């Protein structure tokens, strides 16, 4: 696992986007990027929209979708992606699970097969304050494939800001599993704010345990973590020095 700690919080999105752009430019023959939703990637998508790099050779696959929400629902992740990225960037193909399907488990199997067929070259991730990645909550087996999951109360409360009321936040989601995510060739995880500091410390310096799903990333061969100072605040002094030095070298 490699990591960078950016000097200023506002640089987090640009640095993260530049890492993605390197892959987009490096692979004109075709590239599959796994995309995330929530607050963590918003700045990255804003940088992407402004840059308008040619992505007609890029296929995207999203991590998850709420069960019960149709693609045109204002709070679906289909709509989220359309508003924050897809309406400004022309991709070859873009895929998001269908949350309004009559059989979410069948849709999970279909989506798992699709992801396996495409193969993810680089996966963009955020991290929850409880260490979840995608909607893989604490306790999810490390070998889990795409599945239907029940959302914890803390996750629903964290996502309430995207809805009018807590009661409107769905209780289930279709999500790529931890095992599915780990099959990506590269992983880019972006985290900011003190609210993520404990999860980041556990992910980077704690033991690999399903109590903090993101700790599995310690076992992946190619992970880059981009943090602001607040998210990195609980890391060891040595880890902070390493992350700051990596950022300095990247910016040269």
UniProtKB/Swiss-Prot annotation:
Coiled coil: none annotated. It comes from the Bacteria. One of its GO terms (molecular function) is identical protein binding. Pfam families: Glucosamine_iso. GO terms for cellular component: cytoplasm. Its EC number is 3.5.99.6. Pathway: Amino-sugar metabolism; N-acetylneuraminate degradation; D-fructose 6-phosphate from N-acetylneuraminate: step 5/5. The active site is at residues 64, 130, 132, 137. One of its GO terms (biological process) is carbohydrate metabolic process. Transmembrane segments: none annotated. Belongs to the glucosamine/galactosamine-6-phosphate isomerase family. NagB subfamily. This is Glucosamine-6-phosphate deaminase. The gene is nagB.
